[in-house]
Amino acid sequence: MQLQTVPTAIPDWSGDLLAIAVFQTEGTLTLTDPYTTLDQRLNGLLQELINEGEFQGKSGTSLLMRLLPNFPLKKLLLVGLGNREDFNLEALRRTAATIARTARRERAKTLGMALPHETLEAADAAQAIAEGVILALHSDVRFKTDPEARKLLPYPEVVTLLGLGEQTAALTRAQQICDGVILARELVNAPANEVTPVTLAETAQQLAATYGLTAKILEREDCGALGMGAFLGVAQASDLPPKFIHLTYTSPGTVHRKIALVGKGLTFDSGGLNLKTQGGIETMKMDMGGAAAVLGTAKVLGQLKPPGIEVHFIIAATENMISGRALHPGDILTASNGKTIEVNNTDAEGRLTLADALVYAEKLGVDAIVDLATLTGACIVALGDNIAGLWSNNAELAQALQKASDRCGEKFWQMPLENKYFEAMKSQVADMKNTGPRSAGSITAALFLQQFVDHTPWAHLDIAGPVWTEKEDGYNNPCGTGYPVRTLVEWLCSLSS
């Protein structure tokens, strides 16, 4: 698919499908320029159809019409943007996704899109529209053999953005960002017999070779030498070797900020001896969603090459399996900072792997650490499927992440680090247990992770809900969403300016 901007006036564009987005009105929509010119060329047909359908431009509504055979446009699509006061970049992304999916269903080879940008910068609008199109049209059919699954993939061939001026740089940036999102999606979508800890390590090495990053892979023995007892305790039941992945992006020139991103990398989570049951185990290939997003972000930075920053991408990759070597409930592990952990639930394993990864990250002397993990079902209970939980020991870091998420439409909600709740995680035989009581489960998980960060500004993102969707939603398709690659890229690039 080719994305482009052209100076052609909206009424002069010709092709298979022209999509026009309009704001909501109190009554039936009355066309204004430049659409009145188009309506005049159609002898008033457009306004007539709007009146018949009582189209008001409400969000989520659309009106598709086939035009006269001799007209240079084959079809015209009106899409509602909703209230003008609610208009933002995310509205553009979601509207663009609706248009792109319609073009594919209608088998339109050429698609013209006329979307307003109001007070938004034209470059930002072009990037948001392009992101919506690319992500909506991404279809992961790698494991399908039926040709029917691929018959619509060629559509549309060319997408033209109208009324935004020349925006080649914005479209290129959108494609590069979406490349990272799609990598994250496809890592999450692939089954655990395809994406293993070895696969994640190989992916990191490929990214390093392609984009000029540096990759360091620690094997089981290396991790043992560093005292990573928590990570290796989880890994000991699997027949597959664990891989501790350290990928680094260093910008050209002077580095002003050093950041570590730590992603949970459980390529399959059976729950261990606290075995998951039917209804909870089938989708546990997605338990490496944090690692997938970290690698997706690395891919984007390798292409954008923002100045002034050094970013460390860290993943403790393993499976959580059952075998004669598996962790028992009640076992005590020693993390690499010397703290001891009584494992009272083997299905709370992600925090154990993250514990050693956080200690490792802090020893790098970074200015901030952000970990992201499909950590708790409790966070989904609290915030639902579309919002991630955010915990931080640093207000400035939390605000910066929130600002980036607002621009990208990937929602976070800040949650409290209520230290009193950690009292319930204290162990009679070790420094702490790995889980607390049933209540406030996402908060106690964050408090557990905080024990492995001494002084560095740190944020924890529990992405268990939004990393996966069962249904089409905006520009997200069923399965992995690639959340929150775009937010991380936005935040990291803001540090380089």
From Swiss-Prot:
Protein name: Probable cytosol aminopeptidase
One Pfam family in the UniProt entry: Peptidase_M17
InterPro entries assigned to the protein according to its UniProt record, in alphabetical order: Leucine_aapep/pepB, Macro_dom-like, Peptidase_M17_C, Peptidase_M17_leu_NH2_pept, Peptidase_M17_N
Binding positions (Mn(2+) 1): 269, 347, 349
Protein species of origin: Thermosynechococcus vestitus (strain NIES-2133 / IAM M-273 / BP-1)
Entry note: cofactor: Binds 2 manganese ions per subunit.
Signal peptide: none
Binding residues annotated for Mn(2+) 2, in chain numbering: 264, 269, 287, 349
CDD domains per record: Peptidase_M17 (cd00433)
Gene designation: pepA
Cofactor requirement: Mn(2+)
GO CC, alphabetical: cytoplasm
Catalytic function, reaction form: Release of an N-terminal amino acid, Xaa-|-Yaa-, in which Xaa is preferably Leu, but may be other amino acids including Pro although not Arg or Lys, and Yaa may be Pro. Amino acid amides and methyl esters are also readily hydrolyzed, but rates on arylamides are exceedingly low; Release of an N-terminal amino acid, preferentially leucine, but not glutamic or aspartic acids
Entry annotated with the keyword Metal-binding: yes
Enzyme's top EC category: hydrolase
